[in-house]
Amino acid sequence: MNLKLVFRIAGVIAVINGLGLLFMGTTFFAMANMTATPNLITVGQFTGVTVLFLALLQWRIPDIAGDAFSSLGQLFAIGYAMWFLIIGFHIMMGQAGGATAYVNLVVEAILAVLFYMQSKKSE
């Protein structure tokens, strides 16, 4: 495994989440134990497009980052750790749960560790 592969894996996972938010918001939110109101669906669609943009960035970073590649890996490690913390907080507060929340919690933790470890190896 290398940092380029971690970016690509993260990009594919982001595409899955982005498409889920954009086209299957009701199901996506129901799986997180949230009531899918029209307003939440609208925010979810906007967030879905944003996540799709992040997926595109994650896919392209290995090809365009140059000397900053390792630093960007470390930055993404921090970002995934932040997502892990906010998802964990929402689960603990009872604001999210179900398969969506727990699977994403595990995925964010794994990706944070992989980004950190692989970016250190790339230095």
Predicted stretch roles:
Residues 16-22, 40-62, 75-82:
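Core segments of alpha-helical transmembrane spans in multipass integral membrane proteins
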Residues 7, 11-14, 48-51, 73, ...:
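Residues within membrane-spanning alpha-helices of integral membrane proteins
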Residues 1-3, 62-69, 95-97, 123:
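Membrane-interface helix-boundary motifs at transmembrane edges
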Residues 63, 85-102, 120-121:
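Membrane-helix boundary connector in multi-pass membrane proteins
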Residues 22, 59, 88, 112-116:
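Membrane-embedded alpha-helical segments of multi-pass transporters/permeases
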